Curated annotation (Swiss-Prot):
It is found in: Cell membrane. Belongs to the Casparian strip membrane proteins (CASP) family. Disulfide bonds: none annotated. Pfam families: CASP_dom. It is a multi-pass membrane protein. InterPro entries: CASP_dom (IPR006702), CASPL-5 (IPR045009). This is CASP-like protein 5A2. Keywords: Cell membrane, Glycoprotein, Membrane, Transmembrane, Transmembrane helix. One of its GO terms (cellular component) is plasma membrane.
Length: 177
């Protein structure tokens, strides 16, 4: 019986073609990007902070008399809806082991994160300004709920910080495509 003997044959390196770049390597999955555990945790954190800020504001009986507080409620509702929807998408992508690197989807996420981050930051700043006005300048914290206003505003800033991280990481993903 003729048995073949294994042999190692050296393979030459293909010659480089002038003007042709080597194939691009895909960027590693950095935690916090869409479709990762970190991305899911960021979205859930955004949702929780915005939901608690919304709940605190709505629990104050006269919040609707101040426009900045109404704006904060509207911004946190939008933030809750956006973050919950993307948390569901991230969770689904993790369950079925799919990558969320479609250019159109990543572009949509960048724009959505940018818009919600801007709105949440503006609402938190406006609410912080009114809270400082009521507490420090007018000295009417006894009649108003300054501690609740401050807590809701601080939570809105935390939600903004987390959505800003999502925006930066998603923008980086889009820019390195």
């Amino acid at each position: 019986m003729n048995a073949s003997h294994p042999a190692v044959h050296p393979v030459g390196v293909p010659p480089a073609v002038a003007g042709q770049l080597p194939p691009r390597m895909r960027m590693k999955e950095i935690q916090g990007m869409p479709g990762t555990i970190g991305g899911l945790l960021l979205r859930l954190g955004q949702f929780c902070f915005a939901l608690v800020a919304f709940s605190i504001m709505v629990s104050i009986e006269n919040f609707s008399t101040v426009t900045a507080f109404c704006y904060l409620v509207a911004a946190t509702v939008l933030q809750c809806l956006w973050s919950l929807a993307l948390a569901i998408i991230d969770g689904y992508a993790l369950l079925v082991k799919r990558s969320l690197r479609n250019s159109l989807l990543v572009s949509l996420l960048v724009v959505g994160d940018g818009v919600t981050a801007t709105l949440t930051f503006a609402a938190a700043c406006a609410s912080a300004g009114i809270t400082v006005l009521i507490g420090n300048d007018l000295r009417q914290c006894k009649e108003n709920h300054c501690a609740r206003y401050e807590t809701a505003t601080a939570l809105a800033f935390l939600s903004w910080f987390m959505v800003s991280l999502s925006f930066i990481l998603t923008f980086w993903l889009l820019a390195t495509r």
